[in-house]
Structure formats: structure tokens, C-alpha cells
Amino acid sequence: MTDLSKHTPMMQQYLKIKGEHPNEMVFYRMGDFYELFYDDAKKAAELLDITLTARGQSGGNPIPMAGVPFHSAEGYIARMVRAGQSIAICEQIGDPATSKGPVERKVVRIVTPGTLSDEAFLEDRRDNLLAAIYHHKEQFGFASLDISSGRFAVSELESLEALQGELQRLRPAEILISEDFPYTDILEGFTGVRRQGPWLFESDTALRVITQQLQVRDLTGFGCEDLTLAVCAAGCLLQYAKETQRTALPHIRKLTRERREDAVILDAASRRNLEIDTNLMGGQQHTLAWVMDRTATAMGARELRRWLNRPLRDVERVRQRQQAVSALLDGFHYEPVHDLLKRVGDIERILARVALRSARPRDLARLRDAFHALPELQEALKPVNSHHVVKLATVIGEYPELADLLERAIIDNPPVVIRDGGVIAEGFDEELDELRNISENAGQYLLDVETRERERTGISTLKVGYNRVHGYYIEISRAQSDQAPVDYIRRQTLKNAERFITPELKEFEDKALSAKSRALAREKGLYDDVLETVAEQLAPLQDAAQALAELDVLSNFAERATSLRFTAPEFTDQPGFDVEEGRHPVVEQLLDEPFVPNNLLMDTKRRMLVITGPNMGGKSTYMRQAALIALLAYTGSFVPANRAVLGPVDRIFTRMGSSDDIAGGRSTFMVEMTETANILHNATEHSLVLMDEVGRGTSTFDGLSLAWATAEHLAKNIRCYTLFATHYFELTQLADDLEHAVNVHLTATEHDDSIVFLHNVHDGPASQSYGLQVAKLAGVPQDVIRNAKTQLAHLEGLEAGSTPSPAPVSVNEPKPAAPTATKAASVEAVYQGDMFAMAEPSVVEQALEKLDLDGITPRDALNQLYELKGLLAK
């Protein structure tokens, strides 16, 4: 591929362009197709399931080729990008009619997973983010950009754990890292990871690029002047965005500094376990967002997900949102607001496309409809008694001039693209109307001229015609040609006729022959002018879009509060949680029968709840429900409870579920311990910690020891608010040993050898775990269940026969039994005894203890040995 002389001029052109874009798949425009060659063609054929063919030869071998029609290329490109590929769009920019050699082509745009703005490529209810990471030791600068809206944010993160949390929160579509970035294991699962040269992260260059983009002298006004690492990341990101878009980015006007301490922090494991907007299978069903999202607009849905993923710690801001929700609830004001917002649509992304000059006719039609809805929306907001809503209404404003412009300029139902015209409305531009009239009505015009000239001249053989060589003409038979008026100019003499032209017909000819192309050019020019006029007000329009998205979330919260019977939580400076009749917001929607609500009380005297109870009794649901109520409250939403009073929360941790990390080479137990270690290192007294089945992934004694020590550390050293679910009933002793720990349990009852889960939470420890009954429900064969019951009876008998100790020893509720010594030996390996108790010495041990080894004779020693052997046999 390097010796260009062996290739045709067209392939030489392609190879030169491909050499400039080695990391992108080049979509090379050839007439009505985009063609791909060599490895790009092979990859496209595999990913898109299209035919792989060949064109010409290279080194004696056919050149692989694949292609897609240009008019349907968007769908193919979208599939490639979703697979993590980057696409270089190479268009014909020269005129084939005038080109000598290959038509001039150039790459006009690079489409990458993180720089999408076209509606066809984007998921409408989720952000599509480009991110960049710059590191120094274990400190990280992080930047993110949504090019489809202009949101640009930076932060500095103090640990790898914090970086993982941000990646899990934002889920960027594309991530830029330096060539020497060493922590690639945390990027497992992200498809669009791109390594960039270290010079692209250089601090002076980065600062210059950012200040030029934002049109400022420094970053003091954005609070980012001291964020060296974040600025390096942001500079690389911005350069990459400009390179891919090949145009200015005027919609990127602000830089937001995100501070972790401003939000309730959730680490990566907690986000996964709580299923905020992605379930454990990677889908979106049965998540918190799935329940909470009834927003009217896609931009509102995206804002909602930002709120759910980043609850606020600033209680005043939370109360401001909550008060706005209450005001929208009063008199059901949210209902007309919701209906009007549906007419507004996703103007946030439309405005970004306006800024990038890639907005399509239907974008402008939707923008027109949105502007028409704003006056009615302002009327609907007037009775809402909320200072915050008033502020939002002021920012939203009205745009009558733009509404009028778009009403006059764009037809009601425009085509998808401007390419073929038919977008600008009749009456908007006199010249365009005339050109269209000429182009569309040329035939009728010529008939009218023919009729008029026959009447004027009285020549019956007169007719008007056209040919490609001579254009338009008036033809008169040879017999009547001498009657031609003086204003007729002879154009052509035929055997039986003369052809003439008139000044009027010549003028029409000049217009008609170029009318269609001139009309299209005129229409495109007018369309660009309309885009430019809208873009002139980009800044206030973007602010209005943000305010509309926030209003959408608030009205959505009001609707959810009504439909789901949520109540407004109260906030206090005093630590703790007091929830009456709390419910799990997602599980409640999935049940056919009513959800069983439960109370939650945690205060300075109840910092740890040790939760026991049957398998499937609802322990995990109860714990997650507590976390989701706290999360919803700190977003400004109402919560699923009759009453809720919440103290300060700085972080929410969860150690729940079990799965190994095959890619990372970590066992289930290693994953569990890693998550536990993270909690023990980072939790504070204001953290809410959910611990489910700690220690179950290893041997009984190891697991119990770790669970006990972990619970003690959380309760005594950190003093955080902990829900600690366990099947180690020994841990119920913690309530007696620790000042702030209490036992609670989930109830169940047995009926006709089956189990009924009551799902009620009561104080005190559970009596048993009903493991065999749950196994029966799961379909474990009956002979296995019977054998398990036999083994359980023996184990419980061993436990009942052991020496009592001050620490609890029961695994299940004791049932007296007396197994034989031989049977005891056979089950010794699985007996879950008391790790803190000393067993009573056996008869053999007592006899050995009495022996005087220094005074015994060899014969007596031998006799004693026989006696001991006899005792052991008994």
C-alpha cells in the first residue's frame, strides 16, 4: 500500500487520505455510495453483514471493497459507532463535470462514539459523553463533554476508587487516556478507549485551548484555576472534539467544576447494586430510573438521570427543589406543564446542532413548535407558588421573533434534509418563489405565450418549442414567416419553417434553464441564514433549554409523588433515619400483591441494625429500600414512605450480591473483600452502609471472624449507619456487646411443611433461616431435602450436647438430640460450632493429663497405652 505509483489515481487519492486517518474507518464517497477498502472493508463486512467484493489489484492481489448507499449510510455508521469504531466521512467536494482526474475529496467529519451529535446516532434519554483522564501518581484529572448539548465539566479525584466511581456514574461512550496511563484494568467494559500522545495533555497548551474556546483570559471565573490535572484532561478532550468535528464549537460556553464533596457519593459497586439506571444485566428495565421517569422531554429524562446519579448534600438546594415539587402538586399544576413540555421537545440537542450548523429542517420545525408553546407554558406557570419555579420561568422566557421567523420560513412538514429543497415556505422570499414558479410552471408559461402570440399576430401556425441546442423558440411556417412582427429575432432557418426568439422569451430562457439549480442554491442560502439568526441567540436559548429540562424533572417528581403515593421527606441536622411505612420504589411496582411496608429507625443509640431472618425473607429488599429512600430524598424527590426524617448523609455504600471478576482474575470472595475494604477505608460517621452476607465466600470460621470484626469496626471505630444482614446467628451477640447495635429480623411462618414469608421487620434476632424450606421452593429434589434434614438434626444435636459458653453458638434454633461418638466424628468437619468456646476434655484427655511420665516404668507405660486405646474404642 506504500507504493502509490502502482495504483490508479483514484486509489492513490484514497490511500493518501487513509494514511492521514489510520485509526478511523474511511467512508470514501463514490457517486451514490460510500466505499471502504482493504482492512476497513473486511471489518465493515463483518460488523455490518454486507457483501465483501474486490476492485482492481494491489501487489497482484484484488483490493477488498465493501460499500453502503449514501442515502442510508446513517444507519450503518450508527452500528459501527455503537461497536466502538471511529468513522472518517470523506466527501466529494469537487465538481465531477469539471474535474481533471479524480474528483477532489476530503474528510469533512470524524464520527466517534463520544462525539456524536446527529439524532440518528444518539440514545435520546441518556447522555453521550466524551471523557479524558490525566494522571499524576494516584491523583487524577477528569474531564467530560457532551458535544450534543455543550455540557463541559471537570473534577480532580484523589484516588483510583474515586475515579472508578465517576466512570460508573457517567459511563462515557469514549475515553481519552495518555499513552503511559497504567490503570487500564478499571477501563474493562468500556469500548471506546483511545490513547493520546502526551503532548496533547500539556498544561500550557491545554489552558490556551480552553481559554480560547470560552473566550476568557483565565479560568478563575469558573473556579478551575487551581485544577492543573483537570485542565490537562480538558485541554486534550477539547482538541480531540475540534479535530473530529472539523468546525467551531460555539455551544461549548461554560466549564463546570464538579466537587465530590457537594454530592452524596456512591462508589462503583453501590451504583451497580442499587440499579439506579442500569440493572445488573446491563439493561434499563426495573431500575430506579425506569420507575421514576415519566418526563415529557428527552432532555428532561437525561437531567433526571443526572440527578439520580448525583444526589446533593446541600440541603438548602434540595429543599428548594422539594418546595417547587410541592407547589406544582398544589392544584395539580404539573399536569398542564407536563402537556406543554411535550410540545417543547428536545431543544437542548437541537440547539447544539444549530451551533454546529448540522441542524436539519425537522429540527427547525420542532424548534418552531417549541417557541409557540412557550407563551402558554408561561401562563401555566403563573399560579405556581414557588420562587424557584418563577426563576426558571424567567430564564425560559419567550422568543416571539424567532417563532415568527421559523413560522414564515419553514413549511409545516419539511423533508428530512435540505439537499433536495422543498423546505422554505412559499411567500418567505420573492426571488425563490419566482424561481420555483419558473421551474415548476415552465410548460404552462410556454402555452400561455403561444396562445397570446397567436392572438397578437394572427399567425395560426405559430407555436412555441424548445431544444437543447437552440433553447426556447417561436416557430412559424415558411408560408407565414413574412408576417412575423418586427420584435421577432430570427434564430434558425429550417426547410419548412423559421424559428424566432423575442427578448421576453430570451429572458425566460435564461431563468428557466437555471431556475431549478438556482432555486436550490437560493433555498440553501436562506436556510443557512435562518440557522445563523437562531444561532445568534444561542446563549440565552441554551440557558432556557437547561431551565426547561429542570422544570420537566420537577413536574415529573410531582406526577410520581401523586401516582406512587410518595411523601415529602423532612431533613434535620441531627444524625439518623426515621422512616415510617417505607417501601422499595421498584419492587413495589413489580408485585401483583400489595408491598409490605416497614419502619426504619436509626439514631445515635441505633447506629447498627444486625438483620437476620429467612432466606428470601426480604433482608436485601429492606436494605436497598433504605438506601433508595435516602437517595431520592437528596435529589429533591418525594419518597415511598408515610413519613421520613433524614439526617446528613455524605456517602452510600453497599456490599451486596456475589459475582466473580473473571477478567480481573478475582474470585467472588476477593471481590467481596475488596468492596469491604473500600468501605472500611472510606466510610464516615455520616455514611449509610449496607452489608449483606459478609464472609459467606470462605470457610465458616474465617467468614464468621471477618464478619464479626468488620461489624465491630463499623460500629465502634467509624460509627456509621449500618444495615448488616447475616446468616451467622452468632453475630446477634453484637447487640449485647456493642453500645449502638440492635437486632432486627424479617418474619416468616411455617404452614403444612411450607414457609410463608411475612416480610415484616421486628426488633430482636431471628430464630432460624428456613434454608431447607427455601431449597424445597427452589425445586431441590426431595431425596436431597430428606438427607439435608437428617444432617441438620445431627448437627443440631451436636450443638445441643456441647458445653455452654458465654458467646452464642447456635446456627439454627436448638433441637435436643444425642448423636453417637462415631457419628459425631463423621460430621465433625462441617460442624459450625462456637469459635470462642473451649470444648470439655474427653475421658482419654483426662487420663493422659493424670499420667506421671517421669515416674512411670516402661511396662506400666505399655499397660497404660493399652488402656487408653481401649477408652478410645469406647
Curated annotation (Swiss-Prot):
NCBIfam families: mutS1 (TIGR01070), PRK05399.1 (NF003810)
Gene3D superfamilies: 1.10.1420.10, 6.10.140.430, DNA repair protein MutS, domain I, MutS, connector domain, P-loop containing nucleotide triphosphate hydrolases
Stored HAMAP family: MutS (MF_00096)
Keywords, alphabetical: ATP-binding, DNA damage, DNA repair, DNA-binding, Nucleotide-binding
One Gene Ontology biological process: mismatch repair
Family that this chain belongs to: Belongs to the DNA mismatch repair MutS family.
CDD domains from the UniProt entry: ABC_MutS1
UniProt key word DNA-binding: yes
Domain of life: Bacteria
UniProt name for this protein: DNA mismatch repair protein MutS
Pfam family, one: MutS_I
MF-aspect GO terms: ATP binding; ATP-dependent DNA damage sensor activity; damaged DNA binding; mismatched DNA binding
SUPFAM superfamilies: DNA repair protein MutS, domain I, DNA repair protein MutS, domain II, DNA repair protein MutS, domain III, P-loop containing nucleoside triphosphate hydrolases
